[in-house]
A protein has these predicted regions:
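Hydrophobic adenine-recognition pocket in adenosine-nucleotide-binding enzymes
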Residues: 151
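Class I (Rossmann-like) S-adenosyl-L-methionine-dependent methyltransferase catalytic domain
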Residues: 2-142, 155-241
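A conserved beta-strand element that flanks and buttresses the S-adenosyl-L-methionine
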Residues: 147
Length: 241
């Protein structure tokens, strides 16, 4: 009986999730008629639409979901002798503020100006800076490592292609970004919604990552346990026409 109840619960949960995602995607498509990309993400931030009580960047940015990567990203930076990092989008800097920046120059960038102004007020130091940057349209600063967590999952295919092409223009050395390594296929969304992506599958076709950090994500009852931060040398990532 317990197994039957669990199966029934999962079935209902998946049905509700599909209806909810349809509503969200439809709502975002309507907004795209009148709103810019900046408007969409500013609205999400100002109204806490990702719904975490600790971080306006969402539940994936609270300390419970980032405890593994705080340690592993630090190890990666040391291993690959990273001296400067561009974190885009940096969000509200909630979990990253726990990082040890003693031997690292950090630039946090985001499309939401209000976020950046708040981060400057709270966290700016001689080696920690923030700036407003549109990942798709603006010139991106060159860095040893471009860190792009929980970003491309919110972009349409078209906007992911634009973002990757813009990142490659920087001649930076490495890209570390969110990757769901066990997903077998990718589906498109309007920018501002969310879904998992596997960058090694079509239509992206990234090569095998140089490094994979499993986040041990427990969100949504461990549905996303394959969530990782994957590292590539930028020169090995394809450009898109």
């Amino acid at each position: 009986k317990l197994k039957l109840h669990i199966k029934k619960y999962k079935y209902l949960y998946n049905k509700i999730s599909k209806v909810y995602n349809f509503y969200i995607n439809f709502n975002i498509k309507l907004k795209h008629i009148f709103w810019t990309r900046k408007d969409i993400f500013t609205d999400i931030y100002l109204n806490n639409k990702w719904g975490d009580k600790y971080s306006s960047s969402g539940t994936g940015s609270n300390l419970n979901q980032t405890r593994i990567i705080l340690k592993e990203v630090a190890n990666t930076i040391k291993k690959y002798e990273i001296k400067n990092i561009l974190d885009i989008p940096c969000g509200d800097f909630y979990w990253m503020k726990e990082f040890d920046f003693q031997v690292l120059n950090y630039v946090g960038a985001d499309i939401v100006s209000e976020l950046i102004n708040e981060n400057i007020r709270k966290f700016k130091r001689s080696n920690i800076n923030f700036k407003t940057v549109d990942l798709l349209e603006d010139e991106i600063p060159e860095s040893d490592l471009i860190f792009c967590r929980d970003c491309l999952v919110h972009f349409s295919f078209k906007d992911i292609f634009k973002a990757i092409n813009n990142i490659k223009k920087t001649n930076s050395k490495y890209l570390m970004t969110t990757n769901f390594i066990e997903r077998s296929h990718n589906h498109d969304i309007p920018t501002g919604a969310w879904r998992t992506i596997n960058l090694c599958k079509p239509p992206f076709n990234f090569p095998k990552p140089t490094l994979i950090i499993l986040e041990n994500c427990t969100e949504e009852e461990n549905q996303f346990s394959d969530k990782s931060l994957s590292l590539w040398e930028l020169k090995n990532i394809p450009e898109y026409i």
